[in-house]
C-alpha cells in the first residue's frame, strides 16, 4: 500500500520532507499528492531545486501552472488560507503532514480530518490533547489505529530522547540539564529589527543569542517520570544548519566515560541503528549537514565527574534528520491502520 500524503506548509521542513522522500528511495511507500502553501508556485519549485544548506536537488523539478513536477511525479499545488477549504477528501489523503509551524492543537487536527484526511502529523510539538507524540525509535510502537492526530515532537527532542533513554536504562537518571546550541532560524533577523523577544531583534549572523526553549517539557512529554527533574536552556548561533546538544545527567549507578561510550556505540550499531550514530572523529558542525540520524554522539566529548555525573555532546541536522523521522512516523501511523 502506498500512503497518500498531503503537505501543509512548504517551508524548511516541508521541502526537506519531499527531498528526503526521493533521496531515501521510499516513493513506493509514500506518494506526495498535494502541497498547500501560500507562496507562489514558481518560488516553491525554485526553493525545492536549489537549497543553500543541502545543495541542488538531484531530481528534475519544474512548475506547470498549479502543479509541481518532480521527476515523473505530478503534485497538485494549493494556496488555501483556511484548513476547512482544503480538498483532502477529494484527493483521498491518508496522512496530512502539517509543516506550517503554526498549527498544532487538537482543533487544527480536527479541521484536517473534517476536510477529509484520515490522519494528521504535526512537524512540531503539539498541545497535550493530541492523540500521541512520537519520537521515532523510542515510542512509535505505542501508536494505535485510533491515534489520528499526532505530533512528531521537535528536532531537538528527537535528538536527545534516544540518548536519555539509553543512559536511563543503563544507569538510572536522577536529574539532568540540557543546553541546545542551535543554528539560526527563520524567526530571527538578518539585521536588527523589531521582535517581541528583544534578544531576537538582533542580527542573527552577529551574535550568540539566548532564546526560550520548551525542550524540558518535551522530555517530560515522552518520559513523565522526569517531571521537574530536567531543565533546558538554548542559544542560537550564527550557522544556518546543524545543532549540538550538551546533555548532563546525574545517574544512580557509578560509571566511567569509556563505559558510557561503549553503551552508546553499541546502541548505534544495534537497537538504535539508523536513529543514533556514534563518532570519535574530530568533526565540526558542517560535517553533520545532511545526516539522516536523529542523534550523532561525539564520543570524544564524553566526560564523567565523580562517577555519577555524565556529560555528552550530541549532534543533529535539525532539518534533515527530522524530515526523515517525519517519513518514518508517517509509515508507522499508516502501518497500524485507519479507523
Swiss-Prot record:
Q: Which domain of life is it from?
A: Bacteria
Q: Any one Gene Ontology biological process term?
A: pyridoxal phosphate biosynthetic process
The UniProt site entry described as Activates thiol group during catalysis is assigned to 182
Query: Per the record, what are the reactions this protein catalyses?
Result: D-erythrose 4-phosphate + NAD(+) + H2O = 4-phospho-D-erythronate + NADH + 2 H(+)
Give the annotated active site: 155 (nucleophile)
Question: Pathway, per Swiss-Prot/TrEMBL?
Answer: Cofactor biosynthesis; pyridoxine 5'-phosphate biosynthesis; pyridoxine 5'-phosphate from D-erythrose 4-phosphate: step 1/5
For this UniProt record, the keywords arranged alphabetically read as follows: Cytoplasm, NAD, Oxidoreductase, Pyridoxine biosynthesis
Q: Name one Pfam family in it.
A: Gp_dh_C
Q: Per its UniProt record, what InterPro entries does this chain match?
A: E4P_DH_bac, GlycerAld/Erythrose_P_DH, GlycerAld_3-P_DH_AS, GlycerAld_3-P_DH_cat, GlycerAld_3-P_DH_NAD(P)-bd, NAD(P)-bd_dom_sf
Q: Would I find rRNA processing among this entry's keywords?
A: no
Q: Where in the cell is it found?
A: Cytoplasm
Which EC number applies? Answer: 1.2.1.72
Which residues take part in binding NAD(+)? 12-13, 81, 318
Family that this chain belongs to: Belongs to the glyceraldehyde-3-phosphate dehydrogenase family. Epd subfamily.
Task: Relate the assembly described in the record.
Answer: Homotetramer.
Q: What does this protein do?
A: Catalyzes the NAD-dependent conversion of D-erythrose 4-phosphate to 4-phosphoerythronate.
| Protein known as | D-erythrose-4-phosphate dehydrogenase
Per the UniProt entry, what species is this protein from, by scientific name? Citrobacter koseri (strain ATCC BAA-895 / CDC 4225-83 / SGSC4696)
Chain's gene name: epd
